[in-house]
Amino acid sequence: MSTLWGWVRYPFYTMSSMMGLGSAALYYYQNEIIYPRNIPAGARTEVPRPSQYEMPNSEELLLPTPDGETLSAFLMRPENKSQAAPVTILMFHGNAGNIGHRLPISRILVNGLNCTVLMLEYRGYGLSTGTPNEKGLVIDAQTGLDYVRSREDLRRNRIVVYGQSIGGAVAIDLVTKNQSAGDIKGLILENTFLSIAKMIPAALPAAKWLTPFCHEYWRSELLMPKITEMPVLFLSGLQDEIVPPAHMKQLFKLCQAKTVVWKELPYGDHNSTVGEKGYFEYIDAFLEEHVLGKR
């Protein structure tokens, strides 16, 4: 009987050990999973520059944070100042890669929509120093906004915060804390999520039992109802294979802003939504009608 019990309990001990190891791995290495800043290869050292994407009126910046990190950033403006829209877009990119990989997006915002764009690199990504975590990225976002506010040549522009995926969570947090100042005139969100805890079962189904061990939160679902003082545009790729489109729909329903615009990109997946027909037309219309009040 004792021998039989030994064989019976062996799988339970093995499973218990695996769960323990998995829990420890998620707890101690979750930042490597949540913030894959080394993907693709060379992402920390090879950063394309605005001059390579027909944006000559650009500045390559190094912004110091209050906690001692240095953030890489690009400030890009329309070449023809007389045609420039009085809009500054503070852009927070999605996960992996670096700001250089998103220059095709900013090129359309700058050369097509005539907006000024500040694209900020998170700590630990690209050429920025440090290691990414929720607390740090919150500081980084505030550093970017404070920089825009400090520029005399941008003072008359209307600030619009634009976030994709993890950048959407960063944007929501920043706007919630700064909307009372009255200088943020719009928020644009693409394929972002309710919270990290609710993302784990979708992105890593086998690890859903490890959710309680997650110490990165990004609770956008709790912050979204607090955003009331500016128009919000939701851009949802309905084929998103990483963030379930239901997350975006729920954030839309939670939003209490007076003006909330919902736009679906039927064939857009997590990374291709930005390339879908209508994407930039939706942004242009949102800026014209709800930020600049021209329509």
Regions found by a protein language model. Give the residues of each.
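An N-terminal hydrophobic leader/cap segment in hydrolases
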Residues: 13-62
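Membrane-embedded segments
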Residues: 66-147
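Short alpha-helix in the alpha/beta-hydrolase fold that links the catalytic acid
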Residues: 105, 220, 244-253
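Short beta-strand/loop motif that positions the catalytic acidic residue
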Residues: 227-228, 233-236, 240
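Catalytic histidine-centered segment of alpha/beta-hydrolase-like enzymes
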Residues: 242, 268-280
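Catalytic histidine neighborhood in serine/cysteine hydrolases
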Residues: 252-272
